[in-house]
Amino acid sequence: MGFNEFMSKLFGNKSQRDLKEVKPFVDKIKVAYGEIERLSDDDLRGRTAILRQKIQDYVKDERAEIDKLKVEVEGKDLDEREEIWAKVDKLEKEILDKMEVVLDEILPEAFAIIKDTARRFAQNETIRVKATDLDRDLAINHDFVSIEGDTAVYQNHWVAGGNEILWDMIHYDVQLIGGTVLHKGKIAEMATGEGKTLVATLPVFLNALTGNGVHVVTVNDYLSKRDSEWMGPLYMFHGLTVDCIDKHQPNSDARRKAYNADITFGTNNEFGFDYLRDNMATSPKDLVQRKHNYAIVDEVDSVLIDDARTPLIISGPTPKGEDQLFEEFLPNVEKVVEAQRKLCSQLLIDAKNKMASEDKKEQEEGSLLLYRSFKGLPKNKQLIKYLSEPGIKSSMLKTEEAYMAENMRNMHLVTDELYFIIDEKRNSVELTEKGIDLLTSRTDDPKFFVLPDIAAELSALDNMESDAEKRREAKDEIIANYSIKSERVHTVNQLLKAYALFEKDDQYVVMDNKVLIVDEQTGRIMDGRRYSDGLHQAIEAKEHVKVEAATQTFATITLQNYFRMYHKLAGMTGTAETEAGELWDIYKLDVVVIPTNKPIARKDMNDRIYKTAREKYAAVIEEIVRLVEEGRPVLVGTTSVEISELLSRMLRLRGIQHNVLNAKLHQKEAEIVAQAGQKGTVTIATNMAGRGTDIKLSAEVKKAGGLAIIGTERHESRRVDRQLRGRSGRQGDPGSSIFYVSLEDHLMRLFATEKIASLMDRLGFKEGEVLENNMLSKSVERAQKKVEENNFGIRKHLLEYDDVMNSQREVIYTRRRHALMGERIGMDVLNTIYDVCKALIDNYAEANDFEGFKEDLMRALAIESPITQEIFRGKKAEELTDMLFDEAYKSFQRKMDLIAEVAHPVVHQVFETQAAVYERILIPITDGKRVYNIGCNLREADETRGKSIIKEFEKAIVLHTIDESWKEHLREMDELRNSVQNASYENKDPLLIYKLESYELFRKMVEAMNRKTVAILMRARIPVPEAPSQEELEHRRQIEIRHAAEQRTDMSKYRTQKDDIEAQQKAQRDAASRPQGAAAPQTPIRNENKIGRNDPCPCGSGKKFKQCHGRNL
């Protein structure tokens, strides 16, 4: 007995320990249920209201304290404000922690309430209760509720996912266990058909009682809409609001309302994209999401593991995005690819001839040629077929071992003859000297596609004896040349990758002249996703469809970091145990295996292994024919669109009726999968298309042996194979599963070791024979584990890079949210002024450069130095910073007070005379370079005597500078991430270099952003316009009446003013006291529709608004 087995016997295995922990809750639920089921329907609903109130009463003291602190913060100095806001943050965290305590306390009663609600719906056609306002609202849009006088009548049937359903489910004990596990913030692994969707109702209901919102996350929009409609009535019966974000357009009022519901359903991508959109919003009313409280992720493995390798990105056009070289260099690359194909085909022919010889030396030469052909074109079908012959693969692997020895010292002898080298495992392509020569054969410059040694060239330039101006010009030319060549090399590399590593109908499909990515895990099209770094454009060029313009990142986050923001995260799936380590490492999520309600009766058979793919597919077809004759339904799982179409053609030739589900045919997915359990039905599904929909069997089918699962290839992940098996044998139904494998399969080619190859040879494996061998099955599993480790490495690597971005993102998004909401904007602005003061002192005090300090101070803060030269040289940096900040703060306050003082008379006049007509007013404020039209609430601006204008101005400037700086920073971070990969050639860790360099980039970005913000704020004033002509007045009225956005303004309309404060103040006061009509005040905004950017410009030019007067908005 091993140590692990001994410990399991002593303490029980993990699963037993987990269930022991949950059992007391289940016992309490049963006790509570006995009392709850005796209540009337109205009393049952009343219990929910009592529980909701109990939660709010538990945290009312903390909420009152927060309200009190928010009132106190006004008028406090910077240090006191920071202290108060820190207390507010701490109290908000305490509220969440206290709520968890009270939720655990009321869990048995809440679970009993929802279980009994399910029972009442299952056992009664209608439930009659006293009508509330919510019931009346529900009756307007939902047919399962009707109002009869003061009574609300709930039906037990409704439409979900386009189908009429009759409620017939009541929670089992194992589902109560699952619900408790989910409430505790863990992952519940439940077998297919065990009712995961129903399990979720328990923790969703409980946590929704807090009013903080619960997010139920699904893998596709069909499931999110279906589940919200299917489970929604249970929640609505108790007065909870339910909505689904996928039913509404992004940034719409309807979507905002969906997030404000107690329970919100949606897809992982849309939740993530809404978060990014919120962090690009320019007004609080544009925000849709609330704080991230509690999320339950359905098919958690698919969302947190499979989708986690692709970050969510919102991108936009980049300058010169149309100037791309993919189509220009496509003929060069096609020429190289074609030459490689011919070479590798000839190498294979020569290798076969030599290896057939009796001479050992000839055989060795043949083995070398075979290995060379493999390095050049590993996916060549003839090569794959030849490698499955006895002794061939093991011979090639021995050759590989010999040339990889001594750190691949002799590998060049293999690869020099090739044009490029493909490494499938690393997903990389590398041009050889021979390939570069062929590429450049069409050009005059033999180094056309070769990057110059820029460091050596710049070093040589520094040593030249010439004047500084000439050296600078030469340096600029070297850098420009490097930039041009770098883009060429990158374009060619991406085109080569597109040809060598990406295959149509496997990783992507072409539909409607567009290249669409296929999710390798589910076989679904990934709408809106594009390969990054120019790879998508390269594939578009290869497929001769329109090459889309290059884009740049505006906002990005990985799903890992998005879901880690939730206060509490839980998930459910049928298959998570194999990835339990990763789920704990990254998300700190524990996996708990929930026992099945009935024992599993499915028969899982050993893999059947064939030599070639052709034999394997022939055997699959024979098996399908046999099973159909027995009257059993068959679900055939494939790994690509190509294979599903091949099997479909083979079945058509045999006259077998069947349905195909793949990325090209996904519209009727749920409908086809639901029908897949009927007698003699054959369904071919790419990977796990149709996941989330139950396959129900008739009594006749169960008698015949149940649903038969046939896997046509082992997937790279054992988890996906388990998902396919799990489609059969739900709720104790009979069924079977079997996988057909060939030595030509992708997994076997890449990861099957020499041991497998030699074992096959020893077993005397002949063509047409089938093997069912435990040793081989274990070898396949070991190969899968290898790939899983590899994929985990990729995801962890992605996360490590994104963690760097995440810490920066948190700083920027927090500052941005403070500006947007306005509550902490005053404190943030003062902090920014202080940071600029500190940076100025740090930059000049150490070098004792007082003159430089004075000049930079005027540029940054637009004030004279309050510090003399003697004080500058005699005091410590901290004291100097405080002195400078005091003066800067006073100057800033004076300027803001002056703006309020000048603006208020105009605001007051408009409010007094036209408050019934206008709701908002535009106030122009300039920094001397551009004019910002600041939109404010008219009443608020008058009541605060112009102070609210200052707050809106600060918000507008901070948001503008953050967005401009962050967008540019993301572009630089993208470039940095690409450039640091070369560090590995110098035996340095690219991630470490990335961390160091990105910190420096971020520090500089924040410093520049602070300076820009402060420079605008410290120069702010209300401009004094020249009296406009009547035509200009009318023209301006048309535009400005509708727009409160910031805009660039033609400064020729404004007088050139010196920075003489007294003259400036006088001019502004004169402008404020000028009689009405002498210079028209800024026109307020009416409550009417805005001009869309694509609408005709109101000036009458005939151009679109965005191309005319809206160009600079």
From Swiss-Prot:
Residues 1042-1113 are annotated as: Disordered. It is found in: Cell inner membrane; Cytoplasm. It comes from the Bacteria. Residues 1103-1113 have a biased composition (Basic residues). May bind 1 zinc ion per subunit. One of its GO terms (cellular component) is cell envelope Sec protein transport complex. Its main location: membrane. Its cofactor is Zn(2+). ATP binds at Q175, G193, E194, G195, K196, T197, D694. It is a peripheral membrane protein. Residues 1042-1072 have a biased composition (Basic and acidic residues). Pfam families: P-loop_SecA (PF21090), SEC-C (PF02810), SecA_DEAD (PF07517), SecA_PP_bind (PF01043), SecA_SW (PF07516). Keywords: ATP-binding, Cell inner membrane, Cell membrane, Cytoplasm, Membrane, Metal-binding, Nucleotide-binding, Protein transport, Translocase, Translocation, Transport, Zinc. One of its GO terms (molecular function) is metal ion binding. Disulfide bonds: none annotated. Its EC number is 7.4.2.8. PROSITE patterns: SECA, SECA_MOTOR_DEAD. It catalyses: ATP + H2O + cellular proteinSide 1 = ADP + phosphate + cellular proteinSide 2. Zn(2+) binds at C1097, C1099, C1108, H1109. GO terms for biological process: intracellular protein transmembrane transport; protein import; protein targeting; protein transport by the Sec complex. The keyword Signal does not apply. Belongs to the SecA family. Monomer and homodimer. Part of the essential Sec protein translocation apparatus which comprises SecA, SecYEG and auxiliary proteins SecDF. Other proteins may also be involved. HAMAP family: SecA (MF_01382). Part of the Sec protein translocase complex. Interacts with the SecYEG preprotein conducting channel. Has a central role in coupling the hydrolysis of ATP to the transfer of proteins into and across the cell membrane, serving as an ATP-driven molecular motor driving the stepwise translocation of polypeptide chains across the membrane. This is Protein translocase subunit SecA. It comes from Porphyromonas gingivalis (strain ATCC 33277 / DSM 20709 / CIP 103683 / JCM 12257 / NCTC 11834 / 2561).
